[in-house]
Amino acid sequence: MSSLSIAIGMVVDDAIVVLENVTTHIERGSDPKQAAVHGTNEVAISVIASTLTMIAVFFPLTMVSGMSGVMFKQLGWMMCAIMFISTVSALSLTPMLCAQLLKLQKKQSKAFTMFYRPIEKSLDGLDNWYARMLNWSVRHRSVIVIGCIVFFVASLFCAKGIGTEFFPAQDNARIAVKLELPIGTRKELAQEISEKLTNYWLEHYKGIMKVCNYTVGQADSDNTFASMQDNGSHIISFNISLVDPGDRDITLEQVCDEMREELKKYPEFSKAQVILGGSNTGMSAQASADFEIYGYDMATTDSVAARLKRQLLDVKGVSEVNISRSDYQPEYQVDFDREKLALHGLNLSTAATYLRNRINGAVASKYREDGDEYDIKVRYAPEYRTSLESLENILVYNAKGEAVRIKDLGTVVERFAPPTIERKDRERIVTVSAVISGAPLGDVVNAGNAIIDKMEMPSEVTIQVAGSYEDQQDSFRDLGTLAVLIVILVFIVMAAQFESLTYPFIIMFSLPFAFSGVLMALFFTNSTLSVMSLLGAIMLIGIVVKNGIVLIDYITLCRERGQSVLHSVVTAGKSRLRPVLMTTATTVLGMIPMAVGGGQGSEMWSPMAIAVIGGLTVSTILTLVLIPTLYCIFAGTGIKHQRKVMKRKRELDVYFEAHKDEIIKK
């Protein structure tokens, strides 16, 4: 569906060029059938070349890897198919319909005249103004070139005010909240707090919040999925659903920020995490700057993580900072004495197995019903396995059937230990994640790196930036390489069409101004440079050169008909102005709903549409002036070179005629 939305404005470009040229021939008095044939033949090569340049842009997208590849592979295939079909239709169906439906009407109705005559006068006035302006431009070439260079350099200053991010966060109307009370908090108290918060949120966000569910308690040992999550009697997890974005006046990010501020009023929460989108992963997740701290000694890395967290909270745009390593939890550990085990005829494995079965349970039998089979687990009742004294009195039987208490085999002690030990590349790691709200990811990462540079770091500890920023840099690198490849492919296509390296070189001068337009559009709309806006910039490579191809192709046609360089440039510019403006207008108008549209998913595609609108608008305006001017410069240089060659040839002919006898004698 996104491919169709993007292609709506582009799919009619080829038909517009063909239809406009056929209409021009009919207005000059040609028969509609002859006009359809001759008009289509005149622009067929440029239409095909324009389509090939678009395919050269979108086909490489099918080979991108990583997260960007997942996003853009289908887009690339769909756009290639759509552009191919639109070109075939423009070169076959459009001329046929023109021959059958178009005719020069000498008398028009009054209503048509009243409506169309002002538009026609305006367009004719625009054509004449552009012809005069183009006539002045080609006679003041240095002014035009210098002015365009100054404009390009000035637009680069907009880059300083543009932040970077991976993907824009999407409003999917979901929020997850994870709260931690002090370890050891009773489940009844956690449920009471959960119920209180649920009622408050449903009342405070009435008309905005649809559902608010919560879970409290420790997962059972046979609940594999739940046991992999952080859980316990002191941990509360909320799953919240809001109404659709179009049905509320507040954004999902604003709701999350308000909830974070409200949770700060509860001192009983040791940790409070509000997760936009309901998950920390995926393209709907809120942007976060992740700093990975590597080090073997856990006390040292915990200290570094705590210091980094305190300083990151002071960074502008950071609404929440989380440390991946959970608080140390109390647990009972049994230190077995091997001598006592041997004395009672037991080994370490047997004693540990007995202890585990009595606490976690052992499968004693099976229960079968309706063809299904269920395990029956047997274990001690909670009052006999939850305190230090009860653990010490658990009985273990040796081979003789003698019962021995755990306290007679070792010592039961209470210790604090981390729930999990994270590792990456076989090294211990703790991650500090700064949740970003209202600031670009790149700015927060730069601020974090500045903090790290000033911190006194133990020699055995290292910190690396990871997460979304690492994915962003990889995607930017891949898309940059892709852009270079696309530029080369587009140049090859144009060189094959014009059978010249000069004309493609002239057309390529429109690309820098497309990127100027992208920077200006992102700057003035307060948007960030993300993977999506880069995709829009890459799309412009194919869209922008289409206008240049149409101009240069018609200038070449006028030159072949015997017109001078200046006359060819002005004639072609005046003739191709309307199709260039129409194709640009259809693409821009097709992108406007995507740029300003609401609903879920609009946040992702909006930067791409903004980039295309800004880049195409600026490049079209400058292309209509700069490309003809550059053509005159290169054509004038070529003519001067030809004159020098012809002059030398004449001089050689004169010299040969004057010294012919001497040369023959020698």
Regions inferred by a protein language model and the residue ranges of each:
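Extracytoplasmic/periplasmic membrane-proximal domains and adjacent transmembrane bundles
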Residues: L19, D302, K309-I486, V490-F498, ...
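Alpha-helical membrane-interface segments at transmembrane helix boundaries
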Residues: A36-I48, S68-C80, L126-R141, G163, ...
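Transmembrane helices with small-residue packing motifs
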Residues: T62-M71, V143, I149-T185, F225, ...
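Flexible hinge/switch segments at interdomain interfaces of large molecular machines
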Residues: L97-S109, F166-R174, Q229-N239, S270-S288, ...
